[in-house]
C-alpha cells in the first residue's frame, strides 16, 4: 500500500502536465471486493475536481469530461486507457481490470462545479476513459447520482458505454432529458461471440447491448452505436460488419459509425501479448501493421 500512496502523491505533483488524468488529492482507503466483486480491490479517493477540460490539441468533439472511476473491469484487451494506471504505480494488465479507483465524492464535486459562476454549462461527455457503467457502478451508484445532478442543473451530457447496467437508470435519464439534451452511445465492436469473448471478456454480450440500444431509444433517449474498434483479421469481415450494422439499425440506433483499432504505446505490448496466446496466427501480422499507433492510411 505504501508504494501506491507514494505514487499517488507523485501524480499530484505532475497534475499540470495531464489535467484530464490527475484529479485526486487524497487516497482515503481501499476495500477488497467480496461476493460478485471477489478478486477486485477498490481504491477510494476524494477528487480535487471532477469535470476535466480536454486538451486543446485533442480531436474529440467535446471539451469537458467526467470519469468517476479509473480502471475498468470490462477488461478489454485493446483499451487505450490502460496506461493511465501506470501514473499511480499500478500495472496496465490485471491491476487496470481489478484495482479500480473510485472517486467517492464525485457526485458532490459535480454539484459544486456546475453550480459555480465560472461554469459555462457546456456539454459534458462521460465514458471517455473508463466505462461509467462498469460493474462497480452497481455498488457505488456514482454515475446515477451524476446524471441526477446534471439533469437538475439542465446541463447537456452524453454517455458512452458497453454496459447494459445503463438500463437501471432509465428513470433518471428520462427525467434529465426533460431538462437538457441527453445522448447515449453504445460501443458494439462485433456480434461474433468468439471475438467478443477473446477481446472484451468482462462486458455484457453484444446482443444484449443491441437490445439496450432499442430500449433506450424506445424510452426517448437518443442512442447511437460505435462499431469500435474494428479489429483487422478478427472482426473486419464484410459479413461480420454487415451483421452488427444491420442489428443496430433494426434496434433504432440514431447513428452507426465505425472506428478502426489503434494501439498506443503500452497498450500495443499488452494487446500483442494477449494475441500471441489466443491467436498466434495473427500476432506477427499485427506486429507488422501496427508499428505505430494507427494502421497505415492505405489500410484504413
Q: Language-model segments: which ranges?
A:
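Auxiliary Fe-S-binding modules of radical SAM enzymes
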Residues: 1-46, 52, 233-300
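Conserved Radical SAM active-site core
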Residues: 33-70, 77-185, 189-197, 206-215
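A structural motif
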Residues: 154-155, 221, 253
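Conserved strand-turn element in the central/C-terminal portion of the radical SAM core barrel
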Residues: 191-195, 200-202, 215-237, 261-263
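Internal, well-ordered alpha-helical scaffold/interface segments
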Residues: 207-214, 228, 239-242, 246
Amino acid at each position: 500500500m505504501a508504494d501506491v500512496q507514494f505514487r499517488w502523491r507523485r501524480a499530484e505533483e505532475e497534475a499540470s502536465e495531464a489535467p484530464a488524468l490527475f484529479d485526486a488529492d487524497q487516497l482515503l482507503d481501499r476495500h477488497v471486493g467480496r461476493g460478485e466483486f471477489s478478486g477486485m480491490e477498490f481504491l477510494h479517493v476524494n477528487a480535487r475536481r471532477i469535470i476535466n477540460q480536454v486538451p486543446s490539441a485533442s480531436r474529440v468533439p467535446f471539451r469537458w469530461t467526467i470519469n468517476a472511476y479509473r480502471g475498468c473491469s470490462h477488461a478489454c484487451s485493446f483499451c487505450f486507457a490502460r496506461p493511465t494506471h501506470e501514473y499511480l504505480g499500478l500495472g496496465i494488465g490485471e491491476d487496470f481490470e481489478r484495482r479500480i479507483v473510485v472517486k467517492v465524492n464525485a457526485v458532490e464535486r459535480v454539484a459544486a462545479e456546475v453550480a459555480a459562476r465560472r461554469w459555462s454549462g457546456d456539454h459534458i461527455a462521460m465514458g471517455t476513459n473508463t466505462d461509467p457503467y462498469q460493474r462497480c457502478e452497481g455498488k457505488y451508484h456514482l454515475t446515477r447520482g451524476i446524471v441526477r445532478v446534471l439533469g437538475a442543473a439542465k446541463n447537456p451530457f452524453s454517455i458512452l458505454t458497453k454496459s447494459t447496467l445503463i438500463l437501471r437508470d432509465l428513470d433518471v435519464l428520462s427525467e434529465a432529458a426533460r431538462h437538457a439534451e441527453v445522448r447515449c452511445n453504445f460501443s458494439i465492436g462485433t456480434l461474433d461471440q468468439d471475438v467478443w469473448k477473446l477481446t472484451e471478456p468482462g462486458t455484457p454480450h453484444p446482443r444484449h447491448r443491441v437490445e439496450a440500444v432499442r430500449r433506450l431509444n424506445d424510452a426517448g433517449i437518443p442512442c447511437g452505436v460505435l462499431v469500435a474498434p474494428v479489429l483487422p483479421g478478427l472482426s473486419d469481415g464484410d459479413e461480420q460488419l454487415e451483421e452488427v450494422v444491420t442489428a443496430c439499425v433494426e434496434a433504432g440506433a440514431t447513428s452507426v459509425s465505425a472506428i478502426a483499432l489503434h494501439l498506443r504505446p503500452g497498450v500495443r505490448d499488452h494487446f500483442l501479448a494477449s494475441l500471441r496466446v489466443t491467436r498466434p496466427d495473427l500476432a506477427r501480422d499485427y506486429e507488422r501493421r501496427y508499428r505505430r499507433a494507427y494502421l497505415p492510411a492505405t489500410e484504413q
